[in-house]
Amino acid sequence: IAQDIEDDIALGSLNLARIVGTSDGLQVTEDRLSANHHFANVLFNVMRGGLFVDNYAVDKADLISFVEGFNRVEYQKSAAFFEGLEDSFHYSDLIAAAEQTNNASLQRLCMEYLPLSFSRRHGDPSRPWNKFAIQVKKDDGSQLLNFEGNWRDIFQNWEALSISIPNYVESMISKFVNASTADGYNPYRITKAGIDWEKPEPHDPWASIGYWGDHQIIYLLKFLELSSDYHPGTLKKFLSADLFCYANVPYRIKGFEALLKDPHNTIDFDEKMDALIGQRVEAVGADGRLIWDKNDSVYTVNLTEKLLATVLSKLSNFIPEAGIWMNTQRPEWNDANNALVGYGVSMVTLYYTRRYQQYLLNLFSEVEFDQVDISTELVELLNSINSTFVDNRHLLEGKISDKDRGLMLGRLGRAADTFRAGIYADGFVGERVAVKTADLVAFCETSLEFIDHSIRANRREDGLYNAYNLMTATDDGVEITYLYEMLEGQVAVLSSGCLSPEESLAVLDVLRQSDLYTARQNSYLLYPDRELTRFMDKNIIPAADVQRSALLQALVSAGDSSLIESNSEGGYHFNGTFNNVMSAQSAMQTLADNGYADLVAQDEALVAEIFESVFNHRQFTGRSGGMYAYEGLGSIYWHMVSKLLLAALESFQKGLEQNSDAVTMGRLADHYFDIRSGIGFNKTPDNYGAFPTDPYSHTPGFAGAKQPGMTGQVKEEVIARLQELGVQVVNGSVTFNPFILRKSEFLLGSDTLVYFDIKGEQKSLPLETGQLGFTYCQVPVVYSLAEQTSIELSFADGRSESISGNSIDADLSMAIFDKKGTISSIQVALQPGLE
């Protein structure tokens, strides 16, 4: 038995290494901690996002099960297509064969097929909204190809995954945009079997419905950028191809006036539509959760329309000089900022929208067609939003007033209101309008002018940038209140593309000296730590405010404590059962019905103002301002630190591209490695409070690292590590440019790179002094120190090819991406960028 246990442990360890190796998690350098940390990051990344265990191999039976589960009608129509397939074949052959059928519905379904396994839903199983499941085997013990997750978690892990198997990236884009709604949002959950959303549960205080925002823009954009890098030109053919669709989530965002009146309660649930969707799912499959046309088929549109729908939903909530209004009942990346929902305005989303719009500008500027057909309803929304920007361009000459800010928001918001009302009531009529690509370019340019103006307006006096602001709608317009600094804002602005390398350096300099930096972990807090008001110092009404209100004075004199109470020391407090200003307003209505009608009519607004001045609820951000772990006060959230790491690396790379001076480049490199040195794998267990090479969620101010493994941190670090090693893809060509690789990573003695080839077989490659090894798309890559840069490709058939320089051409690069085993190893002679 003991030997059986030992054998099983060895087999399990081998299989685990194979899983990590399939996603390029095996590296050998002199920096053992970095290599081990990368192994852990890759492991946890695939545990969240899943893994293509058999790479591009498609199992015919599983594909049929998938297509039939989505649309039984379409499967039956295309039965001959599936009958003609081999039992197992390459994914690229599936996409090519589906394209040749000229059947858009079949193409769409095949593009959405992702044979992932080893994925589990992210989230604490104790949370009632996480129906937790780990499914890796079928009932008969065979491998189950399945994935499921909250969309904002699973898509970020797919970004890092796709770097090791990049020919799936367009399918990931398809999965993403086909899960977005006509009004521009994504439902909560996504699985292999389709999308899912939360429903109202009146008896469950934890249940709620709504949409997240900032993730959507930046996660989709990262896939688009990857596609452009790895497969230049591929997305352009999708821009005019009707291969995409809209999710039909039965959420109904209320009208603009209702949003202004109560921005906390903005979404109704359409029970009737939900029932109809259920009937459609029963009839055809998961496609029943998509918007249908007037012929009871899935309504399909091109990628241009889908990309526009996403950004128009953001710009319709744009408040000049403030950001994107958070009015869909959900926070953003930081769940702990939950109280910002309603009156919060996100500069974080605007920073990412800036990068997104710049990408669209470049994309539309490069297309070969002059016009593209878009749904009539969306064109009307596009024209309304564009004309709002054009008509108000003169406002960019100076600071925008509250009045003009309110007028602009009103035009943008009402345009979206009109669009949504039509879609909710009648769906799409099915008519298209030809839109000139020149007009799309102009729209991107004009919107970018307003975005850049707002970014400049949100540079703080200390040189940092605002992350979130607060809006107050009044009869005179929209007022802005600025909140305290947050790490999230600095990361987003560094990633926005708006700053020059020199400006990015200035932000990093100030950040290191700010209250966001904590020396105890040589890292960064989400927000400055602070002392909270003690309980005995809360709910104290200044005597001068009581004297301002005849109603409050009358109640004190009458001994009526339903609104205000006085204590034995002569102090005043609001009723202790109140939880917000609405509680106070409700109490005043009761008083009006009981003899205080005149005084309530006179002082209702004043008392509400006093209440808000006492509690300042508007500036309460949520759990982030009232707890001490997770994303709370004094807490380091390692995912945001890794986002900062990657943003600093992007700033360094931009400096290279723009030929920034040596001093700037040196200081940017210093910042990168300073941020890197604060991450756990560079620390002792005593300092980190956990195994240093393992990723952890957060470190509270009073303890060591908490919540191991299942953190979004791993995604950014996987990406950053590959860039540290210098692997880049430019116009479809693999390039080795180790601009930030340190010479100390090269081996001081001999070693062995153990890896797994595309067939899953364990292989080894000897390494000598002055070398290092890793895999890329499961092809072993060996770096050797040399003065002249060159590449030696070894092929599976025994051939070899020498390349002068640091770039592999696009055809050979595609052979690497496609994992067909053509290239068996890559030897690169080079000099690292740093000593």
What are the language-model segments listed below?
Residues 1-835:
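Acidic, mature catalytic/reactive cores of soluble proteins
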